[in-house]
Structures are given as C-alpha cells and as structure tokens.
C-alpha cells in the first residue's frame, strides 16, 4: 500500500478513495498506462462512463423501447393520407425524444440524488443492521438447534422406529377373481 495504491486479488491496481488521477468521466488513461508499462489504475469510486451504450446490462429492453409502430397502427383498408401518416410519425418521434430530454433535464439530477440516497440507505441498513441481525440469529439459534436435535434423537427417533417396525410386518396380498 505504498504511495496510496494497493493491488486486489485479481491483480488490479487501485488508488486510495481520494481522486488523485483523472475525473469521474475519464479516471484512467489506458494508452498512457500502456506507454509507461504500468497497470491500469482502478478507483473504487469512479469508472469510465460509456456515453454510447447507456444500458449495458439491458435493464430496459422490454419496457421503454416504444416506437410509433408499437403504439399507432392502421390496419389494411383504413389508411389515412400518406402525408398525415408521415407527419404523425415525425410528431410522435420528435415529441417523445425532446420531451424525454426535457424531463431528464429537469428531473434527472434530483431523481439520481433521491435514488442515490435510497440505495445508500439500503446498503447501510444491509451492512450495519440486516447482516449482523442474521449472524446474531444464527449464533443464537445454534443453542436451540442442539436442544431440538437431542429431543428428536431421544423421543421421536425411537417412537417412529417402533411404529416403522410395527407396520413393516404388515403384508398385503392381492388376488384376482375370475
């Protein structure tokens, strides 16, 4: 950990949480790291943002990919004028595009702030409340499980073994009548 850097189990070189290199949009310069023969440095708080593929895990593939043809369709025999159809298509597409941009401009950062706070609280509760409660419960339940195991082996096992021996001597034979 000399110089404020450390290496993880996969061999990635990380910096300390303070952003000493780069910014949040391009934290590392891979070409420069290759030139100097250094490992690429990964910061736990920053990563390079892909501005082209903004849904790399395909979270919204089946939900928000709505096009004009998915919403409005004219069956055979009931067609409007071609100009109206083209204008409707253009109006729908442009309105959807710019209204989404307007909404994301107005509400994008506040919603990101709200969801960031929500997931920070969720992570905090999971790390500092849920996991310790579960571990505590598992430790405490071991005592009960030992007592329960002794009870089962002392009372239930002999009882069910005796019942099993009683019913094991029952024989059933079937006969077909002609």
UniProtKB/Swiss-Prot annotation:
Identify the stretch(es) annotated as Required for homooligomerization: 2-94
PTM per Swiss-Prot/TrEMBL: Phosphorylated at Tyr-14 by ABL1 in response to oxidative stress. Ubiquitinated. Undergo monoubiquitination and multi- and/or polyubiquitination. Monoubiquitination of N-terminal lysines promotes integration in a ternary complex with UBXN6 and VCP which promotes oligomeric CAV1 targeting to lysosomes for degradation. Ubiquitinated by ZNRF1; leading to degradation and modulation of the TLR4-mediated immune response.
Q: Where is the lipid attached (S-palmitoyl cysteine)?
A: 133, 143, 156
Task: Give positions of region: Interaction with CAVIN3.
Answer: 82-94
Intramembrane region(s): 105-125
Which Pfam families did the record assign?
A: Caveolin (PF01146)
Q: Which residues carry this modification: Phosphoserine?
A: 2, 9
Region Interacts with SPRY1, SPRY2, and SPRY4, annotated ranges: 149-160
- What GO CC terms are in its UniProt record? acrosomal membrane; basal plasma membrane; caveola; caveolar macromolecular signaling complex; cell cortex; cell surface; cilium; cytoplasmic vesicle
Where are its TM segments located? none
Family annotation (PANTHER family)? CAVEOLIN (PTHR10844), CAVEOLIN-1 (PTHR10844:SF18)
Q: What is this protein called?
A: Caveolin-1
């Amino acid at each position: 950990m000399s110089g404020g850097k450390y290496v993880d189990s996969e061999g990635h070189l990380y910096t300390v949480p303070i952003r000493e290199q780069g910014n949040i949009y391009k934290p590392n310069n891979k070409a420069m790291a290759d030139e100097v023969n250094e490992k690429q440095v990964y910061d736990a708080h920053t990563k390079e943002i892909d501005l082209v593929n903004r849904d790399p895990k395909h979270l919204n593939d089946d939900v928000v990919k709505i096009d004009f043809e998915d919403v409005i369709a004219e069956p055979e025999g009931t067609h409007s004028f071609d100009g109206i159809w083209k204008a409707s298509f253009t109006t729908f597409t442009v309105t959807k595009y710019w209204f989404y941009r307007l909404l994301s401009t107005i509400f994008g950062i506040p919603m990101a702030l709200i969801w960031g706070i929500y997931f920070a609280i969720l992570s905090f509760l999971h790390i500092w409340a849920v996991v310790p409660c579960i571990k505590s419960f598992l430790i405490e339940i071991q005592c009960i499980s030992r007592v329960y195991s002794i009870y089962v082996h002392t009372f239930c096992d002999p009882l069910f073994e005796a019942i099993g021996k009683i019913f094991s001597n029952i024989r059933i034979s079937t006969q077909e009548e002609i």
